[in-house]
Amino acid sequence: MFRIVNGEDYSPAVQQRNIRDFGKAPSLLWTDNGSSNDRCETGGNGRESGQDRVKRPMNAFIVWSRDQRRKVALENPQMRNSEISKRLGYDWKMLTEAEKQPFFEEAQRLRAMHRDKYPGYKYRPRRKAKRPQKSLPADSSVRCSRMHIEETLYPFTYKDGCAKATRSRMESRLSHSQPTNISSSLLPQEHRSSWTSLRHNRVTQAMQTCGRPLLL
């Protein structure tokens, strides 16, 4: 929206009042620096969460490995940090209790200093970030969801259709496997009945093997 500016806005009295009001509200200032914005909005007390986080006191292994890690890194510049950590862990286990004792005492002293400096300190480990799950392609996910919906809404129709299709395929295979030179009309009645029952049994066994419901 636009406001019509009158000539009275530029009078000395109005300008003096604007300057005085502007000086009373310094928190309305905005700068390019993000930390400056926080300080202006919070009255100068804005701090980042990382600065408020208190580190844990060092244990005996950390006290010992500070100088050892630097020494190993200088002697083996091509060694990775993970390999250095494995080597330091192995070397620490190889030390005797007498060799570890000075570092335990130093860690105890640091723990006491930490307790005096932060009396209400409580260790809160950071939560690990969840890894994003691998998503299926769009077309495959749509097909899977569509099949699931169809099977859920029409369970009997879906299963019956599969059973009928499987049965028709089995019957067509059995019909093609018959000898072409023998006609069913020329066979005796008992042979035709035995052949029909045999074909029915084979179809039934095939359907049971496939795990599909059979509709007769």
UniProtKB/Swiss-Prot annotation:
Record-level GO BP terms: cell differentiation; male sex determination; sex differentiation
Keywords, ordered alphabetically: Activator, Calmodulin-binding, Cytoplasm, Differentiation, DNA-binding, Nucleus, Repressor, Sexual differentiation, Transcription, Transcription regulation
UniProt keyword Ligase, yes or no: no
Subcellular localization(s) per the UniProt record: Nucleus speckle; Cytoplasm; Nucleus
CC annotations in GO: cytoplasm; nuclear speck; nucleus
Entry-linked SMART domains: HMG
UniProt keyword Hydrolase, yes or no: no
CDD domains to which the protein is assigned, alphabetical: HMG-box_SoxA_SRY
GO molecular function: calmodulin binding; DNA-binding transcription activator activity, RNA polymerase II-specific; RNA polymerase II cis-regulatory region sequence-specific DNA binding
Entry-linked Pfam families: HMG_box
InterPro entries xref list: HMG_box_dom, HMG_box_dom_sf, SRY, SRY-related_HMG-box_TF-like
Similarity-based family: Belongs to the SRY family.
Protein name: Sex-determining region Y protein
Organism (species): Mesoplodon stejnegeri (Stejneger's beaked whale)
